[in-house]
């Protein structure tokens, strides 16, 4: 068998959120990842002298940098795209450090046009990227990756800016000594649980940004018939990644289908093997397999438009919906969620509260 410590070292911090909502375990996992895979500050020498920077910053705009591999057609890019237009240009000078794949798309073009300085750093090693950020004189650098694919945590360990903030990309504490703040809200990090985060907690009313100008219509408009859904039955949907579907939540979905005759569960198409396995689990629970309907891949605009065909979005647990919940709420579909203890398990409840529908936040799995 594998002991708990070995398990923590073997699993990526982001993956752990699919299996547990224990914030202490998540912190330990993130901490171990930083210590073993990234390194500790004593191993890095920062050449920067920030002492004089504060004085020099008086009388000029605050320089804010966003470091991300996802400022493109990606869940994070969709959420953030509208935010860059809203920065107060008289107070802030905005830099984007893009560390993603070299693709061109509408979201990336929009963000690039909205920031004053766009830097491509994917091809730069840590030394070159560090030199670039230091030369730009960034005051606050926002790490929009955290423990996700495309992160440059090693670069952050070398302190490219006096203040480094963990926000949005990774739903949890970095467990690192090189992230000074985490942006949260009263729901994702409830007052009193700050001790489970190595960063200092800063709260907004809701931590997740959204783009109010996002294109949502599709031509032709989607229909239930075209989507393979029954015209007059209740359609429950969950467009979360299948890795978030746990036995705990699937069992409750099957109970809901048993209680709602004719109702269907509309999920995102995964690979054939996963779809068949889910239908097999449904059959084992006494539910006709065809009551699980799988939505094929679609463009983001088409995907958003088809949300309107659903009656209720059912959240997963312990790793809940984040961008997918926002999508549903924007398209007028209520979201049912049962919050857990950790950050990733509480995002959906935060969004549902922000949307003004707290009655859809369940107090227990039974209530769900």
Please provide the spans of the model-predicted regions.
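Substrate-binding clefts and catalytic carboxylate motifs of secreted carbohydrate-active enzymes
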Residues: 235-248, 255
């Amino acid at each position: 068998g594998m002991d708990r410590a070995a398990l923590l070292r073997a699993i990526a911090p982001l993956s752990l959120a699919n299996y547990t909502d224990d914030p202490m375990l998540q912190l330990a996992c993130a901490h171990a990842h930083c210590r073993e895979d990234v390194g500790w500050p004593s191993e890095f020498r920062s050449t920067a002298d920030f002492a004089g920077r504060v004085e020099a910053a008086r009388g000029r705009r605050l320089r804010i940098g966003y470091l991300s591999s996802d400022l493109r057609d990606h869940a994070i890019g969709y959420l953030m795209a509208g935010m860059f237009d809203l920065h107060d240009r008289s107070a802030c000078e905005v830099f984007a450090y893009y560390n993603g794949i070299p693709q061109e798309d509408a979201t990336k073009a929009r963000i690039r046009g909205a920031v004053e300085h766009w830097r491509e750093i994917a091809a730069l090693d840590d030394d070159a990227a560090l030199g670039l950020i230091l030369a730009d004189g960034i005051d606050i650098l926002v790490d929009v990756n955290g423990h996700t694919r495309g992160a440059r945590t090693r670069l952050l360990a070398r302190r490219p800016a006096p203040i480094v903030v963990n926000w949005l990309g990774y739903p949890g504490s970095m467990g690192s000594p090189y992230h000074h703040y985490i942006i949260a809200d009263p729901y994702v990090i409830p007052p009193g649980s700050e001790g489970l985060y190595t960063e200092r907690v800063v709260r907004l009313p809701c931590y997740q940004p959204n783009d109010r100008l996002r294109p949502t219509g599709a031509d032709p408009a989607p229909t239930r018939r075209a989507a393979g859904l029954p015209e007059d039955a209740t359609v429950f949907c969950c467009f979360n990644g299948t890795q978030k579907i746990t036995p705990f939540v699937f069992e409750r979905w099957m109970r809901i289908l048993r209680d709602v005759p004719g109702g269907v569960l509309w999920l995102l198409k995964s690979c054939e093997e996963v779809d068949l396995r889910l239908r097999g689990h449904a059959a084992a629970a006494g539910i006709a397999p065809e009551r699980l309907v799988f939505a094929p891949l679609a463009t983001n605009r088409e995907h958003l438009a088809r949300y309107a065909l659903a009656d209720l979005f059912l959240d997963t647990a312990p790793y809940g919906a984040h961008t997918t919940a926002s999508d549903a709420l924007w398209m007028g579909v209520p979201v049912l969620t049962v919050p857990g203890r950790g950050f990733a398990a509480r995002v959906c409840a935060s969004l549902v509260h922000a949307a003004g529908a707290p009655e859809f936040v369940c107090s227990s799995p039974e209530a769900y």
